[in-house]
Amino acid sequence: MKPLLNQKLQFSFAFLASLYYFFYFAGVGVYVIFMPKVLIDIGYSAVEVGVIYAAAPFVRFLLPFVFQHLVVLTSRIYFVSLLFTTLLTFLLFLTSDHFWSYLIANLLFGAAMGVSLPYVETIALSTLSRSHYGKVRLWGSLGFVAIALWLGSVLDVPMEAFYYLSGLAFVTFVFGAMLVRFDTIAHETTASNRSFSLRLYWAFWLSLFLMQVGFGGFYNFFTIYETAQGVSLEVIGWMWSFGVICEVAMLYFQGPLLERNLLTILQFATLITAVRWFLLYLFPDSIAMTFVSQSLHAIGFALYHTATISYIFLLYTQKKLAQQFYLGVAFGLGGSVGAIVAGQVYGESLFLAEAIVTLFAGAALFLHQKRKAWMTKDAQQI
């Protein structure tokens, strides 16, 4: 789709969206990297932390169904979600001494966070070229890395993490609110959203789900897996950083690749990700091969993510709802199931299992391609 705004407005949007992504994902970094340790430090058990962090993604999975049948993601709802995200960070702080109260506040916080990102992604896809989108989206990765490096070196008092979470949520609210005026997409209605169908392209959605299940072992156990091989935490930190550097590089230079067939790109990225997990299984104690596998994060995450949201944007008329379902099915349900499965199979064969799951994700994509071709052929014959 061609950009809908003139060059000056595109630049303004790109600038503000870059700031939104930077601070949004910096906040995600605080929430994902530091808050679990904070909860442990203030007296939560590992089981309680596990429940808290498994419940929030599941809410993100349920949220799109609410928007499909009851609510439409309008600019007003988006603005309210930004405001609530900020206010709920204070509620997290106030309820941190009580597990059940904190769990409820965390569920609401996860829901609010899950509303704003699909809204901005949809505007970005309708406003920017695929090449320009990557150069804007990479600021999210930079924000994530920046907060990890900064807070990792200065965080001495656990509760101070709440201050950073609130501050970043507020700055995200400020820049996010400025993006509303760039929303040129026709508003979806509850009636049109009800016609949205996961079953129509079920094999595609199954593939997205399985892909993130395959990432479960990496996100939750990569550090533990490598330390078990005798790799130091310092080296593991560099491994994580190297993967993000490769991710940022791909987001910046991926433009020409995205002019090709998006479904073919997804199939290629899924296959490469399976190879990545096989490398970790075959060479668990090789630092060099682990760095090679980390370089593939550029394809398995950065290229895959951009190709996915671009493909979904073309596949459905309900643009915002489709992006919400991507976040919910893949990172919500897939992330939750992936974490649980990885915990059950953790051991020497962890990444062999992840590779097999990812190969099934690739097979589902090929099935989707065949089904879509049949559907197109049948439509032409009518």
Regions found by a protein language model. Give the residues of each.
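Helix-loop boundary and gating motifs at the non-cytosolic
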Residues: 4-57, 200-239, 305-306
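Hydrophobic core of transmembrane alpha-helices in multi-pass small-molecule transporters
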Residues: 22, 99-117, 209, 288-303
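Transmembrane alpha-helices of Major Facilitator/SLC transporters
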Residues: 57-65, 143-148, 236-258, 335
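A late C-terminal transmembrane helix in Major Facilitator Superfamily
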Residues: 319-347
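Intracellular juxtamembrane helix-capping segments at the cytosolic ends
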Residues: 113-128, 302-316
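Structural signature of the two symmetry-related core transmembrane helices
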Residues: 77-91, 264-279
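Helix-to-loop junctions at the C-terminal end of transmembrane segments
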Residues: 61-75, 155, 249-262, 346
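Symmetry-related core transmembrane helices of the 12-TM Major Facilitator Superfamily/SLC fold
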Residues: 161-178, 350-369
